[in-house]
From Swiss-Prot:
It comes from Mycobacterium avium (strain 104). InterPro entries: Ppm1/Ppm2/Tcmp, SAM-dependent_MTases_sf, SAM_mthyl_Trfase_ML2640-like. This is Putative S-adenosyl-L-methionine-dependent methyltransferase MAV_4558. Disulfide bonds: none annotated. Signal peptide: none annotated. The keyword Ribonucleoprotein does not apply. Residues 291-320 are annotated as: Disordered. It comes from the Bacteria. Keywords: Methyltransferase, S-adenosyl-L-methionine, Transferase.
Length: 320
């Protein structure tokens, strides 16, 4: 279903379902023979959510009819698991480095089913602020509480739509804009219109004191490539048609219906112009760094995103 300006969702629908797909990829990596990351809670979320297309990533085998009709699908799915593993490791290492350097405020924008507040060994005194839709955060908190999980930090949930006045909600939750902070925007930007992305970073700029850090998964140069989008859409349509015959009650959303394909400023360029020291790593380079490589003989097997890491150095104080 196409997006609307004020849409909201449960964890099993629309944008929420994509968080379950990512959790399934983390579960698959965690349960693999040589995992790059460990997320013991990913499987917990899947079990709580029940059956859905997100379980494909975590399942050892596809239905035989689909595997035979779409032989590229399984290596594509493994490529996405490898991509998500590298992405997760990138943000894990970013946050751990920031807190080891003395940063004690962590802000996770559109936290979804991110479980870092429960699984990373944060330094003592670290506060993690998780921002997302109220029903998404409620599902996560309830699921982990029933499982008996406890945060490894001081966790503050901030139930707010990022299209609304989230800076006010963050401040009211205790965030100190005059102390350094570490921010993440992981799997977020394509779900925002270009104007909303611009506003997001402008707001971060008002809240991030000198010494703050940010990590971003940013759309790559092929994000607006219509030919690539059409190839991906046709592949998924064939899978939907096959699935409709096998399991007519299982819905497979088209993630492209949830994204905003609009021209937008390069994230690294924007941060560089606003007083941040920036490092940009293309996705293939990041995957190779972690010894994860996309299938070489399948076009568009993994996202051609860019991973941006930056630290604010200029001395302008954040707005009061």
């Amino acid at each position: 279903m196409p997006r609307t300006d004020d849409d909201s969702w449960e964890i099993t629908e629309s944008v929420g379902a994509t968080a379950l797909g990512v959790a399934a990829a983390r579960a698959a990596e965690t349960e693999s023979e040589n995992p790059l990351i460990s997320d013991p809670f990913a499987r917990v979320f899947l079990d709580a959510a029940g059956d859905g297309m997100w379980n494909w990533f975590a399942a050892p085998n596809l239905p035989a009819q689909i595997a035979e009709a779409e032989p590229d699908l399984k290596p594509r799915m493994q490529g996405m698991v490898d991509y998500m593993a590298a992405r997760t490791a990138f943000f894990d290492n970013f946050f751990l480095a920031a807190t080891r350097a003395g940063v004690r405020q962590v802000v996770i924008l559109a936290a979804g089913l991110d479980s870092r507040a429960w699984r990373l060994p944060f330094e003592d005194g670290t506060t993690v602020y998780e921002l997302d839709q109220p029903r998404v955060l409620e599902f996560k908190a309830t699921t982990l509480a029933e499982y008996g999980a406890r945060p490894t930090c001081h966790l503050v949930s901030v139930p707010v739509d990022l299209r609304h006045d989230w800076p006010a909600a963050l401040r009211q939750a205790g965030f100190d804009a005059h102390a350094p902070s570490a921010w993440s925007a992981e799997g977020l930007l394509p779900f925002l219109p270009a104007a909303a992305q611009q506003l997001l970073f402008e707001r971060v700029q008002t809240l991030a004191a000198p010494g703050s850090r940010i990590a971003v998964e940013a759309p790559g140069p092929d994000f607006l490539d219509e030919a690539a989008r059409e190839r991906q859409r046709q592949t998924m349509q064939r899978v939907r048609d096959l699935m409709a015959d096998l399991e007519p009650d299982r819905d497979i959303p088209d993630v492209q219906d949830l994204w905003y394909f609009e021209e937008r400023e390069d994230v690294g360029d924007w941060l560089g112009r606003h007083g941040w020291d920036v490092t940009v790593t293309p996705a293939p380079e990041l995957m190779a760094r972690y010894d994860r490589r996309p299938p070489h003989d399948i076009e568009d097997a993994t996202p051609q995103t860019r991973f941006v890491a930056a630290q604010r150095t200029e001395r302008t104080r954040p707005d009061r």
